[in-house]
Amino acid sequence: MKKLKASEIRQKYLDFFVEKGHMVEPSAPLVPIDDDTLLWINSGVATLKKYFDGRETPKKPRIVNSQKAIRTNDIENVGFTARHHTFFEMLGNFSIGDYFKQEAIEFAWEFLTSDKWMGMEPDKLYVTIHPEDMEAYNIWHKDIGLEESRIIRIEGNFWDIGEGPSGPNTEIFYDRGEAYGQDDPAEEMYPGGENERYLEVWNLVFSEFNHNKDHSYTPLPNKNIDTGMGLERMASVSQNVRTNYETDLFMPIMNEIEKVSGKQYLVNNEQDVAFKVIADHIRTIAFAISDGALPANEGRGYVLRRLLRRAVRFSQTLGINEPFMYKLVDIVADIMEPYYPNVKEKADFIKRVIKSEEERFHETLEDGLAILNELIKKAKATTNEINGKDAFKLYDTYGFPIELTEEIAVQAGLKVDMTTFESEMQQQRDRARQARQNSQSMQVQSEVLKNITSASTFVGYDTATAQTTLTHLIYNGEEVSQVEAGETVYFMLTETPFYAISGGQVADTGIVYNDNFEIAVSEVTKAPNGQNLHKGVVQFGQVNVGATVSAEVNQNDRRDIQKNHSATHLLHAALKSVLGDHVNQAGSLVEADRLRFDFSHFGPMTNDEIDQVERLVNEEIWKGIDVNIQEMDIASAKEMGAMALFGEKYGDVVRVVNMAPFSIELCGGIHVRNTSEIGLFKIVSESGTGAGVRRIEALTGKAAFLYLEDIQEKFNTMKSQLKVKSDDQVVDKLTQLQDEEKALLKQLEQRDKEITSLKMGNIEDQVEEINGYKVLVTEVDVPNAKAIRSTMDDFKSKLQDTIIILASNVDDKVSMVATVPKSLTNNVKAGDLIKQMAPIVGGKGGGRPDMAQGGGTQPENISKSLSFIKDYIKNL
């Protein structure tokens, strides 16, 4: 058999099937497109469903691909086995109603055994078939010439996922020899058994039956072929290594981990687990981020966060206690190009995301692990189960994925009370949902609304007024025929100019009236059957069903909403231009007085980036671009480059808002006719709303002008107070004052140190020897919390081999700080000292092994805490 690099195997596979008339289907992104049934692309066939189910017809019925995939159903096994992965590549050849078993088997045999391709020894190959699949048996035995003893019948060789296409399959195994085990049926040492000797290298699925609702099977009119070969596994066979992790897909990563950790791979089984976890997870994380996913608290983002934090936890077992996963991204990129250039192209962005996430987790990891270890001790002494409320606190406060807590618990021989954990999670979801609920929204999503099916046409794209008929009135949750003045009512119209809240754009407000009554409209939403449902208060008169009315939108607000919505599109495009294509809309709010835009990005924008975005948007406004709005089919919209919002669902016909060439986006909202109508755009804030999500708030038109006018007024006031004549002198004067303040503060700090030193006397005389350690434990009189740290720095410079613990009372609040020489941190940890002391003074604290700080609210107990910590050190 040829010894080939993984990249060579991939290319040979594609080349072989191209020779056999197959079309190469490029590897699709890991984040599924137009398929809400999948969290990730998890197989080679997942991206081809559109061909198999008939939605699209491929250019050729023969297809070959190498598809990157993610599976996360058994993350806890990754690292502990030879071949479990969360990220992998699946090589596959497919036939959509073209060739079937004969060709599929012959192709597989030729690719594996021909010297031109893999060059495997035929006498080392075995196959499994379904017991009733005589056609496959005859092909293998009579046409290929495989001995009967190397064809194993296994009942499980039938691919079936319930109702739909199904069929038998045949698997091909490679015998790695007696070094991997002696033949012994009792130990499943046979092809198809759980063993390391006979490795499955290819699975050929023959989709020939339809699994019917009554569980009967009928032949399919068009038979299909679906095969899968794991690249990592084939590489391990070709390169003759024991596990996938020793192939050229992983070893460069292992080598880098060895350099960083100082530990060796393949020397210690326990260490090897950590090596494998880190190597597997960094591949998954790098590829997922390159394809548009970001760490978050739910969905696929939660999977990434869980993987990264699991890898960080295992890296600690190798002595790596700082962010380093991001440094592996370049190695992954080098291994996987040129077939996957995306990781290298986005490497800087991927590294920034990973480093940011690592830093966040490291901030809480030590405290979280310390708490978890205490919970484990408590559980072992009582119920052998970690309390669900405690597990939830670890998740909520310290960022520990519950799966990570479970995994550590299992390693300690314990379990987690998941029932209580889920209850706590549900309570949190309920609280969040309650907080999001609009108190003004209609709470009558009842059978009343569901039973109203009469049409209501929105005409507001073209007009802000309409002559229409009031068709339904709902009062106190019931449909009625009339409502009196002063009452709040919900109603529908045959035609309405009022936009219903949707896509981040708020609803229109206005009035609906005739000579007999008037309703002030405050809210418009979508009813269950799609009609616009208006809410308002009857200002005067009696409202009757069937009344002919005038409907008028508040046009001032409408114009401002239009400006803000069109500006939001320009902002989205500008962010992509300045920050990169990874930017996706994560939420928006378009109101009359402001706009808010949430987007995916790994960290705060710089002032320069904000300025660039703002300038780009204003340039498009000043160009006076016509805003063309058209309805078309989704395919035509995508062809013209229209941007679809990530995660949004669209029908067959979509509305395209075109401000070409800068912005083309699918949108159902209301917009200006020309960008010049927006007038002016000003960003007023940029902030974070969660991991990987940033928020911009901005103003347009008159609101932006008034905002700048207010800033100018404040600037003039400041200029007057600084007593300078020109605008240019303001910054110079401020810099001068800041420098003077720093100098004065430095003088004051030095004087405080001198006063403290005089009060303390000779500190060397106060050092005690406790349990073999030099220790200084004392209360200091300082003017503020910052001064206690500077006092500590002063003491450390004089007592370099001494454990120092200081406490102070500042404004009836306790501040404490501890330092331990690095040479002693294996035995004494500053963080532990503070954690022991802080509760005594009614507080908490912690930190690194060499430096920690804390505080409390009970200064009367300072002496008690200092005495306690001396005894604590004495008993270490």
Swiss-Prot record:
InterPro entries assigned to the protein according to its UniProt record, in alphabetical order: aa-tRNA-synth_II/BPL/LPL, Ala-tRNA-lgiase_IIc, Ala-tRNA-ligase_IIc_anticod-bd, Ala-tRNA-synth_IIc_core, Ala-tRNA-synth_IIc_N, Ala-tRNA_ligase, Ala_tRNA_ligase_euk/bac, DHHA1_dom
Main location: cytoplasm
EC number(s) per entry: 6.1.1.7
Superkingdom of origin organism: Bacteria
Location(s), subcellular: Cytoplasm
Cofactor binding annotation: Binds 1 zinc ion per subunit.
One GO term of the biological process aspect: alanyl-tRNA aminoacylation
Substrates-to-products reaction catalysed: tRNA(Ala) + L-alanine + ATP = L-alanyl-tRNA(Ala) + AMP + diphosphate
Gene Ontology cellular component list: cytosol
GO molecular function, one term: tRNA binding
Sections of the chain in a coiled coil: none
UniProt keyword annotations, A-Z: Aminoacyl-tRNA synthetase, ATP-binding, Cytoplasm, Ligase, Metal-binding, Nucleotide-binding, Protein biosynthesis, RNA-binding, tRNA-binding, Zinc
Cofactor(s) recorded in Swiss-Prot or TrEMBL: Zn(2+)
UniProt KW Protein biosynthesis keyword: yes
The keyword Metal-binding is assigned to this record: yes
UniProt binding sites for Zn(2+): 565, 569, 667, 671
Domains: entry comment: Consists of three domains; the N-terminal catalytic domain, the editing domain and the C-terminal C-Ala domain. The editing domain removes incorrectly charged amino acids, while the C-Ala domain, along with tRNA(Ala), serves as a bridge to cooperatively bring together the editing and aminoacylation centers thus stimulating deacylation of misacylated tRNAs.
Matches recorded under HAMAP family: Ala_tRNA_synth_B
Stated family: Belongs to the class-II aminoacyl-tRNA synthetase family.
Function: Catalyzes the attachment of alanine to tRNA(Ala) in a two-step reaction: alanine is first activated by ATP to form Ala-AMP and then transferred to the acceptor end of tRNA(Ala). Also edits incorrectly charged Ser-tRNA(Ala) and Gly-tRNA(Ala) via its editing domain.
PANTHER family: ALANINE--TRNA LIGASE, CYTOPLASMIC, ALANYL-TRNA SYNTHETASE
Name by which UniProt lists this protein: Alanine--tRNA ligase
Organism: Staphylococcus aureus (strain NCTC 8325 / PS 47)
